[in-house]
Amino acid sequence: MPDGSARLLRQRHGHHLSPVKIRFHGQNGENIVSSGLDSCLMSFSIDHDSKNKSLGRASFNKIETRKSGLKLDEHKMPPIVDFASDETKQSDWDSIICVHQGLRLATSWDYIKSTMGKHTVDNERFSQNENKYSNVVATVNIEVVPA
């Protein structure tokens, strides 16, 4: 550089806190999706570091989070403790669904756009007796049936 400063050649990133769940994404197994205690969902490529990407941090209100800045994130959701993914039709709809610690709702994520989806899944039977389900972690299973 003309001013004597160095240029950034490569930059690696990962979870800021410990990962909670790690699993392969896709049929060929080239990508690994992981969730961490930092409420982030990340994708790591086995093929090349340049294909690694962050799918973002789980937030109750993304718009307010952007306005206030990430360091003052009062809308951050609890850590993702379980998730399921399937790449079938992932260009048409969200392909990942996540369960958060201590919450009865599940959030959707778009792998292609690398963002948290607009959909949340909340079962009505859990809202009728919250004390009964407050310490239960739901299991997520996505089944795609060919038409």
Model regions and ranges:
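Structured, charged interaction cores in eukaryotic nuclear gene-expression proteins
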Residues: 79-113
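Structural hallmark of WD40 beta-propellers
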Residues: 8, 28-33, 41-42, 92-98, ...
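Alpha-solenoid helical-repeat scaffolds
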Residues: 105-107, 113-147
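A structural motif specific to WD40 beta-propellers
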Residues: 7-10, 52-54, 117
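WD40/WD-repeat beta-propeller blade N-cap
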Residues: 5, 12-19, 58-64, 73-79, ...
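WD40-repeat beta-propellers
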Residues: 1-2, 22, 35, 41-48, ...
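Leucine-rich repeat domain C-terminal region
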Residues: 37-66, 72, 83-85
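Loop/turn segments within WD40 beta-propeller blades
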Residues: 22-30, 84-93, 141-146
